[in-house]
Amino acid sequence: MNPRSPFSIAILLTLPVVLLSACWQRGSRTPAEAKARLAAAVAARDPSRLWNALDLDTQWSWMTALRAGREAYDITLSNLPEGQLRERMIRRFQPAATSENAAELFAKSLAVDLWPSLAGQIAAASDRAPTQNAAGSEAEIVWPAGRLLFRKASQSAFGWGFAGLAAEAEALKRTASADLEALRTNAADYERAAARGSR
């Protein structure tokens, strides 16, 4: 067996470090780092950086909404007859259908007043560090008028993220999923009606 070259040994020694760094690209190592990441995104008013600052559950909700919206758009085009309802549904699902990924859909959907709202929360939190709960799954900074909430993903590789937009994302996911189920039912009804009409 040929002995390993110094070059190959160096690669093997550095590979775990590279893999570890890649794992931490989603989420932050600590709640304090997650807060800093959020603050930087808000200061820059950068939707992409804000997306990367979110906790994993919030991102998953947007990913689910994206998938549901795309399928709903396809069903609308394929099955709904011409008319006002079809046009309304096309407009409703078009943002998801034309988004390359969930981050882009998130960016399209940001309310204008979100940036000043988040900036105000970060200013109110000042330089205080987030306090973790006993389970180590959440951390928060609380003041009389509000709080900043951070969550750690159950998958250790994904780290901490800002969870202050989680409730809105969950509501969006539920609505998108309900819309999709309703459209699936309607599409089946249209198909049965068309089949009867062709007899």
Model regions and ranges:
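Bacterial N-terminal signal peptides that target proteins for export
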Residues: 2-11
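Amphipathic alpha-helical repeat elements characteristic of tetratricopeptide repeat
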Residues: 28-32, 44, 177, 184
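Short solvent-exposed beta->alpha transition segments
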Residues: 32, 47, 52-132
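C-terminal motif of bacterial Sec signal peptides marking the signal peptidase cleavage site
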Residues: 20-22
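Bacterial signal peptide processing site
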Residues: 24-26
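Hydrophobic membrane-insertion alpha-helices, especially the h-region
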Residues: 14-18
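Short beta-strand edge/turn micro-motifs at domain boundaries
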Residues: 104, 113-123, 129, 136-192
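Short helix-adjacent coil turns
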Residues: 37-50
